[in-house]
Regions:
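Acidic, surface-exposed loops and disordered segments
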Residues: 1-224
Length: 224
């Protein structure tokens, strides 16, 4: 079934039909254990039967161009952005197809934090950068859907309408009033839900540190 789902995902839109992406499939227990530290040892890496690492990949296209006497100017940030978009479209198309077949998936954003370690673990060559990891398996049950902001929070008509304090209050009201989120605030000894995100989960110091790591990765992999 995995190849069938990947075939469906490969029909996703992409930049110039160049398909500047690739995916590394990890099933082997030892290889999953090698990946786990890069994902802060989150248990789904070793517990899931399949781990997929979706990559921005200009390597394959550049090698094809070289073999056909074409000069590909793809060692730049623009190509990294294009290939990142391609990889994410491929990944999301896969996830949609997988869930339609009754599979469970989990996105792992830790891929971007420790891209350097994942590059080593997966032997990724120049012009290939891991973007997102997805674990796949059959769920034990059907979990409740995680809350989302109302559509009005993300949709703008004709032009972008900036948010006022009143509109922010209205858009985040239901999210802040959920008991699970109130518990989240209490457990982290914070005053507001926003503080949990800014002071605990996604701190300025961590954002800056991992930004430096990713910039070094892009330079090392030939995109900067």
């Amino acid at each position: 079934m995995l190849n069938e789902l990947l075939e469906v995902a490969a029909r996703a839109s992409n930049t110039g039909n160049m398909q500047l992406y690739s995916v590394v499939i990890t099933r082997d227990k030892a290889n999953k254990e090698k990946l786990a530290p890069a994902h802060f040892n989150q248990p789904m890496i070793t517990a899931a039967p399949v781990v997929l690492t979706f990559c921005a990949d200009a390597n394959r296209f550049v090698k094809w161009a070289e073999l056909r006497d074409a000069v590909a100017g793809f060692d730049n940030f623009q190509t990294f952005i294009a290939s990142t978009i391609d990889a994410m479209l491929f990944a999301q198309s896969f996830c949609t197809a997988a869930e339609e077949k009754g599979l469970g998936i989990c996105y792992l954003g830790t891929t971007a934090y420790n891209a350097d370690k994942i590059i080593d673990a997966l032997s990724l060559p120049r012009l290939v950068v891991p973007i997102v990891t997805v674990t796949v398996g059959y769920p034990d049950g059907m979990p409740e859907q995680v809350e989302r902001l109302p559509l009005g929070a993300v949709v703008h008509q004709e032009v972008y309408t900036d948010y006022t304090p009143a509109s922010i209050d209205a858009l985040y009201h239901d999210k802040e009033e959920l008991e699970v989120n109130k518990q989240f605030v209490r457990e982290n000894d914070k005053e507001t839900l926003a503080q949990v995100f800014t002071d605990v989960r996604y701190t300025k110091a961590n954002n800056e540190y991992f930004s430096d790591v990713l910039l070094k990765v892009l330079k090392g992999q030939g995109f900067l």
